[in-house]
Amino acid sequence: MRPYKQYLEQRLPMKSLQFYDINDLRLENADRPISAPGEIRLKTASVGICGSDIHYYCEGSTDGQKLGYPLVLGHEFSAWIDEGPDKGQLVAVDPALPCGRCEFCQEGNPNLCTELRFAGSDETDGALREYLTWPVTALYPLPPGFTPQEGALLEPLGVAIHATRLGKVLPGMTVGVFGSGAIGLLTIQMAKLAGASRIFATDRLDQRLGYAQMNGATDVLPADGNEAGRILAETNGRGLDIVFEAAGDDGMAVESSIESAKRGATVVLIGIPSKDETTFSASAARRRGLTIKFARRMKHTYPTAIHLVSQGKVDLKSLITHEYTLIHFQSAFETAARREGIKVIINL
């Protein structure tokens, strides 16, 4: 592309949602980006608001990470390729950009990369802007029939896929999912696909328990501090084979997860507590001989996620309860912060 044409394209305006500080989002004008070698320009289609986005918006940090300000949030997204022979192709976008060279990448764990860049985190701008450039290697073309909204939710589905792989759910197992937000509901769907015979789900919000049943939970319980006792009673004192904690509520769900697990069980912690700390009874975990694993984002999940949705084995559409345009960003973030519905989507 000629330098002058590049200059003209870069001068074309776009809207970009900049996060400056707690409760301070501003929709501003910006220049469209120009792709570097190995990258391609994308026109953003749909962006899901994640729990970590809300932690940033309400508290200024998440998972012990603070941001460089201003920053564009948004890491659950789909987009249309905006240049080249594939212009107009809808793609899912992996927000994680590992280095590919470090010890952990070489071991097959790019989610643990020491040099990882992640959309909408640290100093890497995310997708809440009309255009962005991204490495071609992180794009996954979506088949006909896929909606942009579904494409955006392949990222949280990937988190659920990774978590259930860590848990190693087998047919006939009894599983618990503590926290029935989007990640919890997708974990329920994945546990059901893996053949779990009984799935207990908990949440503090009654409406989310209804969604848990719709997504495959056989038993739903309010997260009132007594759920562990009820689960033990329902399983004749045996407890759960595999437990997934997806609430991120600073300890209560983690403690209940530990107390609900059978001897020798695996407990997978997915949720991110707002205070970056959690507690549970060490003696309860030790007496049970539990294996406790932390789920760090996801790895190698996009092809599987696309296949599962394409085959109708995973339902993403039912999780989308609110949709907004970019100009109504304030309402979108406030709705998500109030935990109304399940998944809030911003369509660009």
Task: Enumerate the predicted regions with their spans.
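C-terminal hydrophobic helical "lid"/dimerization subdomain
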Residues: 4-16, 255-259, 299-348
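Glycine-rich beta-strand-centered segment in the early N-terminal region that forms part
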Residues: 33-47, 61-103, 143-145
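Cytochrome P450 core scaffold surrounding the K-helix E-X-X-R motif
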Residues: 52-58
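Mid-domain Rossmann-like dinucleotide-binding core that forms the NAD(H)/NADP(H) cofactor-binding site
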Residues: 88, 144-225
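Receiver (REC) domain switch-region micro-motif
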Residues: 91, 175, 241-243
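NAD(P)H dinucleotide-binding glycine-rich loop of Rossmann-like/cofactor-binding domains
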Residues: 99-178
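Glycine-rich cofactor phosphate-binding loops and adjacent beta1-alpha1 units
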Residues: 167, 210, 215-291
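Residues in the short beta-alpha loop(s) of Rossmann-like NAD(P)-binding domains
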Residues: 205, 273, 298
